[in-house]
Amino acid sequence: MASIVTRKSSFAVVYMTTVNGVRKQKWETYHTLPEAVRRKEQLERYHDLRKSKKIGGEVETVAQLMSVYLRLHGVPRWSPSTYQSNCGLIQHYIPPCMGDMRLSELSPRTVAALYSQMLEEPRISSPYHKQGGQKLSPTTLRSIHKVLHSAFEQAVLWEYVDRNPFHRAPLPTCRPKQKAFLTPEQIKQLVLHCPPTLALAIHLTFAASLRKGELLALTWQDIDFSRNTLRIDKTLARIGRDAVNQVNQREILHRFPPVGGRQRTVLVLKQPKTESSVRTVYLPPSLMTLLKQSRPAGWETGGQPSPHLIFAYPDGRPMQECTLTKQFQQALKEAGLPKVTFHSLRYSSISYKLSLSGGDIKAVQRDSGHAQADMITELYGQVLEQNRWDLVERFEEVFYCAD
């Protein structure tokens, strides 16, 4: 069992551990007593779990650790969508590359070699991403690293290893591609070629900087017509049925019944992934007028038993992302505009607001719901690039062509 030893300006948690069959005493230093108490309680809970055999036998390989990690860390902590994506990464990449390796064999040097090897491996194909001879991307490797780093942080806590070999592992540089999106003038042209429902979806996405899942989750009750505001506090997602049944369902707000026979996925309204995604956005008066003209009879009472969604099929089921995408691409074609994704409207919105606000990143971030300002500043760079060309043209006009 662990104990706390008081020092001059710190506190040490002292306990016995076994590494590679050798029993030894370990000291961990904390600057405050509450931190030391929390660590002591963690160690005691782990000791109780081992004693009750809920963790299972000894964990010696990476594959065994990932199994315990999913059960003790993933299931109680992750949302269904996070569980589904992380399970996919673990299943497809981690056991094939390092599953049989013993935990004691991993070192920072070994991890660097493994990552170099993984970048030469072909990417796993899926119904959405065909293999096509492409290699594993740096972005995917970073996602794999995030899971492995977290798993080995728990392994240190659970006393399977002394230190995390994935800490400060060398990762490939991700060079983000410049994002293609429509200008405000092109969006005005686009809505002229859209049916009313699609036009409303474009207006809302552009004015409120919405993600696609946030747009399709909107209900009429989310709009405050007296204050011209829109409340964004949920998202529409399609999640594997197994993932929904495995993890805690506290983040799921509504589960839509399946259509037809038994399906492997389920459509749900769920809480957003981050707290910053929950926000209230002010809408322009012209858009509020359009919303008032579009709202159906009985919108005030809400949908029972299903939510009264703004974008839904006639039977009340939520509009699918594929339907929205298909209609959007058809409208782009008819308008003679370049092919971009529906999600790019969010980039158009953010860049336009940055330009209008003179680069007020904080104000735009509160509208977009980004947890970090990195994405905002990246788009701001593209806005500034256009401003630089405008400045050159103005310089030419005023200085060189003045005579």
Which residues are covered by each model-predicted region?
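Short, Arg/Lys-rich segments that mark the N-terminal edge of DNA/RNA- and chromatin-recognition modules
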Residues: 1-31, 234-236, 240-263
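Catalytic-site neighborhood detector that most strongly recognizes the C-terminal catalytic loop/helix
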Residues: 173, 181, 236-238, 368-393
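C-terminal secondary-structure termini that scaffold catalytic or DNA-interacting sites
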Residues: 227, 235-278, 285-287, 314, ...
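Basic, Lys/Arg- and aromatic-enriched nucleic-acid-binding interface segment
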Residues: 124-128, 134-138, 142-144, 157, ...
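C-terminal catalytic core of tyrosine-transesterase DNA break-rejoin enzymes
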Residues: 157, 203, 207, 214, ...
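N-terminal DNA-binding module of tyrosine recombinases/phage integrases
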Residues: 5-11, 17-113, 294, 298-306, ...
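N-terminal core-binding DNA-recognition domain of tyrosine site-specific recombinases/integrases
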Residues: 3, 70-160, 317-323, 338-344, ...
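Active-site/catalytic core of tyrosine-dependent DNA strand-transfer enzymes
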Residues: 14, 137, 261-268, 274-338
